């Protein structure tokens, strides 16, 4: 029987009072996804051989050491995580990774500049906002259809104008 390299489940987010405020879901992980988001290590089961291939978490980083590892293994590597719809862990949203966003963002930027080719990073920097907007629009069918319609109208208008 073949087991996945990374198996991940649900992470339940809880606030300071222990109330459930959210739950992770299955996500299609890609380099674009890792540019601004991550897979949480605490709801993952990772095959040991991956640490031998990609190294261990970078302990010089205070917040994003797991993010860096996943970026290298999944975003830039060939590892494909497999999702199981089971609750694995509770995540306290009052920890340093959720409350010290300035440090988290600075560390992420440091990692991106370290591991991504500069030309690719420049493209991501240039188009990150547009990609995030399109991702948000796709979650709302009516907004996505409206955007598609406007884009088609602009295409026809520009084509007509060139004549």
Question: Model regions: which residues?
Answer:
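A short coil-to-beta-strand element that immediately follows conserved catalytic motifs
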Residues: 5-7, 82-84, 121-123
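TPR/TPR-like (Sel1-like) alpha-helical repeat modules
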Residues: 112-116
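Membrane-proximal basic amphipathic "stem/tether" segments
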Residues: 117-118, 123-163
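Context-gated lysine
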Residues: 13, 23, 53, 62, ...
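Conserved nucleotide-sugar donor-binding catalytic segment
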Residues: 9, 16, 21-111
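Glycine-rich phosphate-binding loop signature in dinucleotide/nucleotide-binding domains
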Residues: 1-2, 54
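A short, conserved acidic/glycine-rich loop-to-beta-strand motif
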Residues: 2-12
